[in-house]
Regions:
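A non-catalytic, helix-rich entry segment at domain boundaries
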Residues: 46-140
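Short amphipathic alpha-helical face segments that pack within enzyme cores
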Residues: 42-45, 184-192
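Non-catalytic protein-protein interaction segments used by genome-maintenance enzymes to assemble
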Residues: 127-188
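Charged, glycine-rich intrinsically disordered N-terminal tails and low-complexity linkers that flank
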Residues: 1-70
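A generic structural signal for short coil/turn motifs at secondary-structure boundaries
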Residues: 31-34, 175-179, 215-216
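Hydrophobic (often cysteine-bearing) scaffold residues that line and stabilize catalytic clefts
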Residues: 35, 39, 99, 103, ...
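Metal-dependent nuclease catalytic regions and adjoining charged, substrate-binding loops involved
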Residues: 5-6, 119, 150, 180, ...
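Short amphipathic alpha-helical segments and their helix-coil junctions
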Residues: 18-31, 86, 164-170, 233-244
Length: 272
């Protein structure tokens, strides 16, 4: 069987449950949207667009208020643009308002920390707020694709800070931990960056929008982790496309109090 171009998401799905991987990436069964995915997309788009705001009327006196007004307008636009998708989820008005306000608070939390960094940059480098804004502006939403490893991914933000390269992903989930799935995602991003640019990024991390930025150093071990997991997946998927080669992993991620796996009904994990 030919190799598929994989992603951090598909590789983590394979590690979580091979049967789920089979349904999603081999049979290509449709998956359902949920509020966490939709609001995550809205938050990502809002942060990406924030760095395109006009700086023409920005001054030392109004920058904080200008930033807050802009990110709220950008967020509101993206929320409205996704209204059809949000309506499809079937949330009642109170539920939708809860997620709207919660996501806005996450963005304001990020912005408050950005303003702190901007003020620190103004002071340390003796530059004005416009120059500091552009200094802190990352390269955004870059696609990287490996011809050698048949894997690709989108990096939310690439920062060059004092001759160091930092790769950042934004997450709206409540955890503030580097779970194994997150560590693998960051390892794959590091490998993709290394293959394209010929050097390792200095650090990779997650900006947990409920909390703050959390970084880890990139070393050879992190790149080797990515290579190992990518190769294990390709070795498995190129040897068989038969459903029996993709066993179920029955557990709490099959069904929980507020939802179930997208493939629960076809998989029937608890039936013998």
């Amino acid at each position: 069987m030919a190799k598929r171009v994989e992603s951090p998401t598909s590789i983590n799905t394979f590690k979580q449950c091979k049967r789920k991987y089979y349904y999603q990436y081999i049979e290509k069964r449709p998956t359902l949207s949920n509020i966490h995915q939709v609001r995550g997309t809205i938050a990502h788009s809002s942060l990406e667009d924030f760095f395109d705001i006009s700086l023409e009327n920005l001054t030392e006196d109004n920058y904080a208020q200008t930033f807050r007004e802009n990110i709220q307008m950008i967020f509101l636009k993206h929320w409205k643009d996704n209204k059809k998708t949000l309506d499809y989820l079937g949330l009642n008005n109170d539920q939708e308002m809860f997620y709207f306000e919660e996501t806005m608070l996450m963005l304001m939390n990020w912005l408050n920390q950005f303003i702190e960094n901007l003020e620190k940059t103004v002071k340390e480098k003796s530059i004005d707020v416009k120059e500091a804004f552009n200094y802190l502006k990352p390269i955004r939403e870059q696609e990287y694709k490996s011809e050698e490893y048949w894997v690709r991914g989108y990096i939310d933000a690439i920062h060059e800070i004092e001759n160091e390269i930092h790769l950042i992903d934004y997450k709206t989930n409540s955890s503030f931990e580097f779970e194994d799935s997150i560590k693998l995602q960051l390892a794959i991003y590091s490998l993709l960056y290394f293959e394209k640019h010929g050097k390792r990024p200095s650090k990779v991390g997650i900006f947990f929008l409920r909390h703050k930025l959390k970084l880890m150093k990139v070393d050879e071990g992190l790149l080797e982790l990515a290579k190992k997991e990518i190769n294990l997946l390709h070795s498995h998927t190129t040897s068989s496309d038969h459903i029996d080669s993709y066993p179920k992993c029955v557990g709490p991620l099959c069904k929980w109090s507020t939802g179930k796996c997208d493939f629960f009904d076809v998989c029937k994990p608890f039936e013998k």
